Amino acid sequence: CTNYECYKGIYSSFNSMNMFEIAHSLNRQYGTEQWCIYRGKHLMTFVDNHDVSRLATILTNKNHIPLAYGLLFGMPGIPCIYYGSEWGEEGAKAPDNDYALRPCFEEPKPNELTELIREMIAVRRASDALCNGSYRNVVLTNHQLIFERRTDSDRMLVAINASDSEYTADHHELQGSFEKVLSYPCAAEAGKSSCDSAAETAADTSASEDGSADTPETAAGAVTETVTIQGQIVMPPYSAQYFHQV
C-alpha cells in the first residue's frame, strides 16, 4: 500500500511553509492514540514516483530537497526512491503522457544529494526506532518539526528546520545524552565534509531489514558525535538532524 497522503503532505508542507500539514498526517496515521489508522503497519513512502512530478520539480525552494528526504527516512513506512531522484532529476507530469517522468539515463549522475541519501539509508537501516518505532510529535511550528521514533530499546529524534533562519527549539522532553547520527548541512572536518566521510562508511554498512544488526554509530560513525541536550535543540537554517538517545 502506498502512502499518497504523506507524499502530498511532504512537498505541500515545504511549499506552503506549514509543517503542521505533514505532522497532522503522520500523527493521524501512526500516532500513539488507539484511533490512529496505520499503527504497526509499514506503508510504502515516497516523495515522487512514476505517476507524479518529481520532487526537484514540484518543490518551489530547492533548499528543501534534502530536507524532504530527511523527513522520508525519519518517518514511519518503507522509503522508496524513484530512479534519478537520488541526484535531483527534474521532470513534470504532462496532461496526456508521462514521458518526462521516465527518461532513459546513459549513466548515473551521483552528487552531494546522492551521498546524503546513502547516509540516511545507512542510519535508518541501523536504527530499530526508525524502522519499527512509534511516532510522536514533540516540537511543531510552521517552519520546524521535531518528532520522536521509539521502540522499547531505541529512541530517535528527527529535527527538520525548513526556514532560512536558525531556530532554537525548546521543550521539556528534549533532555538526555544523544548521538547526533545525521546532520545536514554537514560540518566540515579536517578538510572533508562529514557527509563525504559518512558516504564512504555507508557502503560498507550491513544491517538486517528490522534494524537489529548494527547500531547507528556503526552505520554513520564519521558523523556521530555525543551531545547533551538540556531542553533545547539548535536547528541551523535548512537543516535535518537525527539524534539517537544513548
Please place each PLM-identified region on the residue numbering.
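Conserved alpha/beta catalytic core and glycan-binding cleft of carbohydrate-active enzymes
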Residues: 1-94, 141-142, 148-151, 158, ...
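Carbohydrate-interacting/catalytic domains
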Residues: 20, 62, 76, 81, ...
